[in-house]
Amino acid sequence: MTDRSPFETDMLTLTRYVMEKGRQAKGTGELTQLLNSMLTAIKAISSAVRKAGLANLYGIAGSVNVTGDEVKKLDVLSNSLVINMLQSSYSTCVLVSEENKEAVITAKERRGKYVVCFDPLDGSSNIDCLASIGTIFAIYRKTTEDEPSEKDALQPGRNIVAAGYALYGSATLVALSTGQGVDLFMLDPALGEFVLVEKDIRIKKKGKIFSLNEGYAKYFDAATAEYVQKKKFPEDGSAPYGARYVGSMVADVHRTLVYGGIFMYPANQKSPNGKLRLLYECNPVAYIIEQAGGMATTGTQPVLDVKPESIHQRVPLILGSPEDVQEYLSCVQRNQAGR
């Protein structure tokens, strides 16, 4: 018989991980406070998502947000949770949320040096049918000495200090990067803590899955149509790619990270600038995918190189395994050359 205990006595929790990263960077502790506050909000949202049906949180709150999406009751709750937790961390100065038309400026007595862009509940159109949804965030340093304003959030993704997403699925998971790879943490409901389950996850060089909304095939540009045709009917006799699309970006991106392949929300005739928002949807997931060895592009440039012009700016997004994204870009270049 073994005398090994069934309980882990030296587990790496996300709280401990964040503190260790801060110590290694010889930081002030402000980013540690910020990340821990974000994690508290994520735990609270996870709890609300699990209780939503019983607590009458499904359904529409009776309004439309700034980007034209119907606002769900859980959206409103999640947004308030994140804003309140971040402002009470004393580490933020500007908050940009999908749910707020303008940036939220933290009160002077609570201000810190960080800017946070977030989508409190991504994929909320899937709430009522219990499909996976998530929270996405990116953290930047304020780069000027001026009074905090919306302009402080208009930084390219290359300036990100830390980014991540939470996925509320069969379990609650957080993918987090502070610029040194991507680590995955799962919420242990017994402990109420996120525990490290995978360190330095790497995306496959090439996958076997493509993910996009083929319902919009009527509006696809020539490059997208050509690429999808190649995946479904390979000319080299290889097996076709599998098609997977949840319609909740966090779920689709996380599957792409874990299994490899490509996720696409390209520009089309209906949405010539793309549909996903740069600051709080595209940049955080592009950062995670690049940190894991993948690629993320708008079709014309890396997502993280885009210089934002407005806080709710939309861009096309194609990300995933480097060889798959490169093949898509080859289709784009070929079609541009043929014009």
Swiss-Prot record:
Region Important for interaction with ALDOA, residue ranges: 3-10
GO terms for MF: fructose 1,6-bisphosphate 1-phosphatase activity; identical protein binding; metal ion binding
Residues holding Mg(2+) 2: E98, D119, L121
E.C. designation(s): 3.1.3.11
UniProt-listed GO biological process terms: fructose 1,6-bisphosphate metabolic process; fructose 6-phosphate metabolic process; fructose metabolic process; gluconeogenesis
Nucleotidyltransferase in keyword set: no
Entries under CDD domains matching the protein: FBPase (cd00354)
Site keyed Important for the conversion from active R-state to inactive T-state in the presence of AMP: positions: Q33
Residues engaged in binding AMP: V18, T28, G29, E30, L31, T32, K113, Y114, R141
Cofactor: Mg(2+)
Entry-annotated residues carrying Phosphotyrosine: Y216, Y219
Leading EC class: hydrolase
UniProt subunit comment: Homotetramer. Interacts with ALDOA; the interaction blocks inhibition by physiological concentrations of AMP and reduces inhibition by Ca(2+). Interacts with alpha-actinin and F-actin.
Function: Catalyzes the hydrolysis of fructose 1,6-bisphosphate to fructose 6-phosphate in the presence of divalent cations and probably participates in glycogen synthesis from carbohydrate precursors, such as lactate.
Protein's UniProt name: Fructose-1,6-bisphosphatase isozyme 2
Gene: Fbp2
